[in-house]
């Protein structure tokens, strides 16, 4: 409940949003008992210093059993753990994303945890409304050609089945559905997912032209604002789904301006084929699904987050 000190378990607590959430909770002056679950615990400094760390891979077959003593006695579990690489090992990524979600939910239910907050994504939404805003009732069947989107959709289906089976009893579930998450401090880490190791980061900021479809129109949100939404939902015990995005949406010209490049129209279908060919040739590590998702996902109506959480993004997408 609001203002009450809680024991909070956070999976993926050292990642982009996890780090932002630790900073947000510290800035609020709270003395919550924070527990981090990650594969490789970070050095106990800065935002990581006051966290009790556990090393655990949520993709493991025994993850649910190993998570039970960790979540025992917790007031809430924030599930942020997700895998992005290697994109060629989709089985492992599914075990992290879908299997990990099932494991943390099983453990939370077994230990009677009251609240699970799950990091979903705009990627869980179906195509069909590109460039238009949708609320949380839009289909969560995902983008079929994107492994990331399929897994985000499947993870929500795990939550759907649980809620259907328990019908208002058991763990209360919150689903955050942010747009594409950005954070200046994590930019090199994010770009490393999408670039081969032999390409220096400086290349990205020295592109003379940006070949991209002029239709590009995607929702983005800053990691700090996503963390703020999680903190507000924790305080309020708010359940349900919440869209999170900054305004305005990001266009192709916005991306070109940010990179100091000249935008050149390249149809998304052609871009998708180029991404796929270069991925198959192992020239770069991003699969075509990311390109397909960027030209399929809708924009986000965030009225529910504003009304129920009092959430307002501090960072503009401009």
Regions found by a protein language model. Give the residues of each.
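NAD(P)-dependent short-chain dehydrogenase/reductase
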Residues: 166-218
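C-terminal amphipathic/interface module of NAD(P)-dependent oxidoreductases
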Residues: 262-265, 286-318
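NAD(P)H-binding glycine-rich loop region in Rossmannoid oxidoreductase-like domains
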Residues: 55-99, 107, 127
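Conserved Rossmann-fold NAD(P)-dependent oxidoreductase catalytic core, especially the SDR/UDP-sugar
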Residues: 99, 103-148
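N-terminal Rossmann NAD(P)H-binding glycine-rich loop of SDR-like oxidoreductase domains
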Residues: 8-30
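Active-site Tyr-X1-5-Lys
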Residues: 145-174
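Mid/C-terminal beta-alpha module of Rossmann-like enzyme folds, strongest
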Residues: 227-288, 302
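Alpha-helical substrate-binding/gating segment
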Residues: 198-249
């Amino acid at each position: 409940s609001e203002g009450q000190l809680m024991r909070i378990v956070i999976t993926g607590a050292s990642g982009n949003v996890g780090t932002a959430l630790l900073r947000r909770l510290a800035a609020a002056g709270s003395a919550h008992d924070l527990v981090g679950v990650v594969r490789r615990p970070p050095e106990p400094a800065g935002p990581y210093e006051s966290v009790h760390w556990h090393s655990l891979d949520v993709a493991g077959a025994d993850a649910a059993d190993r998570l039970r003593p960790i979540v025992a006695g917790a007031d809430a579990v924030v599930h942020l753990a997700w895998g992005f690489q290697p994109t060629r090992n989709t089985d492992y990524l599914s075990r992290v994303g879908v299997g990990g979600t099932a494991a943390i939910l099983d453990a939370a239910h077994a230990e009677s945890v009251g609240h699970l907050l799950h990091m979903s994504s705009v990627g869980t939404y179906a195509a069909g409304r590109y460039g238009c805003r949708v609320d949380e009732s839009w289909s969560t069947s995902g983008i079929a050609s994107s492994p990331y989107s399929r897994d985000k959709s499947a993870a929500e289906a795990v939550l759907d089945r649980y809620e259907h089976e328990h019908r208002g009893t058991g763990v209360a579930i919150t689903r955050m559905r942010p747009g594409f998450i950005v954070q200046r401090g994590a930019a090199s880490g994010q770009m490393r997912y999408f670039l081969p190791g032999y390409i220096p980061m400086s290349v990205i900021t020295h592109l003379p032209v940006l070949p991209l479809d002029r239709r590009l129109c995607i929702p983005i949100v800053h990691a700090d604002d996503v963390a703020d939404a999680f903190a507000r939902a924790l305080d309020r015990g708010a359940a349900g789904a919440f869209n999170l995005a900054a305004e305005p949406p990001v266009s192709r010209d916005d991306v070109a301006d940010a990179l100091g490049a000249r935008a050149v129209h390249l149809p998304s279908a052609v871009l998708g084929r180029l991404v796929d060919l270069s991925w198959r040739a192992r020239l770069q590590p991003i699969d075509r699904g990311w390109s397909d998702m960027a030209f399929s996902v809708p924009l986000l109506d965030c009225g529910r987050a504003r009304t129920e959480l009092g959430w307002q993004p501090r960072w503009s997408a401009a």
